[in-house]
Amino acid sequence: MSKFVVKPTNSLSGCLKVPGDKSISHRSIMLGSLANGVTKISGFLEGEDTLSTLKAFQDMGVKIEYNGDNVTIYGVGLNGLKKPLTPLDLGNSGTSIRLISGILAAQKFDSELCGDESLSKRPMGRVINPLTKMGAMIESNNGKLPLKIKGGQALNGIHYDLLVASAQVKSCVLLAGLYAKGETCIKELAPTRDHTERMLKGFGYKIDVNKNKICLIGGTQLNAFAIQVPSDISSAAFFMVAASIAPKADITLTGVNINPTRIGVIDILKLMGANLSLSNEREIGGELLADIRIQSEQLKGIRIPEELVSLAIDELPVIFIAASCAKGETILTDAKELRVKESDRIQVMADGLSILGIKNEVLEDGIKIQGGVFSKPGIVIESHHDHRISMSFAIASLRCQYIIEIEDVDNVKTSFPNFVELANQIGMNINLVNS
């Protein structure tokens, strides 16, 4: 087990390109495998989660070649997957397990999905229920992993109102809908990332999006195309906050995905007074990209608009760090989904902020954070095996007077394998220590 030992620094500068978007990397493997023809991917995120997806489709008979961030997939078509010889172990990846369950629900063969200890605690009823309504047969461990999916079931399209704002559930049902008889429609509670919808269009699949309603009709084939994966805004967010809170900072992040369903973190930081600007905006493969420049600025506490929560759900832990450095109080509500991520991110972040000396009040669906000073020596933070917790508290070191130690950081490799390298490149001082 490894830990971060982070020494305080006060000046950041440079230009970075963070790794490829995790959500898009997952979906490119899945849809490329189900397409007819050869899909070539550049900018693929070589993290543990995305490699779990890649290996799962290799285990189902798909020929996939990869060299760093370049991947070539020889698609087998919608009905070309083969029964895996063993249960598919998706490690820590909730995206993999939930989206792949939608695909496997329609296959002719039986299958089983499992994951690590953390993933095995996360709720799967949210995908089991709509898939069962479509005609799937799925056994679970009281709504948790492992999932045993019975093959040979004929699926029927459904009209389904999402009970949680979840792109994973939405995508699971849409992927099952590719195989279903008739129309499948999803109605969203709130906007969530729309990479599945955009990529289906890229593969030539007709999908209708009308505000919060997404519909498709099963039975059409997917056709391969080239995919260029933009940099992940969830990874870029750590450096956006870093530059905002550092005493002196001026950094630029290049080629970052600014899909409208992902820019909640930008909107929130701007509301807090961040000195943040976008340039060189362009569109590649149906996704919007931009270069983002961030300079240090005194932030102010805000009430985070509830309509931005689902658009920044993965970035909220590092926004907590921004809030702890802001002048005044920041209030977050309507973020109950944070409690069922890799950890209970509301409680775990609150505990860590308390260790740093920051006053906070935990709410059922959020938190109140009073900006302050990180003044305590001998700080040791437990990450609870959650990559975003580890990286968020590493960023907090920029406002600390003393060394911070963050325990159990191996999980950073799931989403941002070169985080330490890039952080140190712009002036941070993070040592990865095997403990």
Swiss-Prot record:
Designated name of the protein: 3-phosphoshikimate 1-carboxyvinyltransferase
Entry binding sites for 3-phosphoshikimate: 22-23, 27, 166, 168, 314, 341
The UniProt record lists the keyword Oxidoreductase: no
Originating organism: Ruthia magnifica subsp. Calyptogena magnifica
Record: active site: 314 (proton acceptor)
Metabolic or biological pathway: Metabolic intermediate biosynthesis; chorismate biosynthesis; chorismate from D-erythrose 4-phosphate and phosphoenolpyruvate: step 6/7
Assembly behavior: Monomer.
Binding site for phosphoenolpyruvate: 22, 94, 122, 168, 345, 388
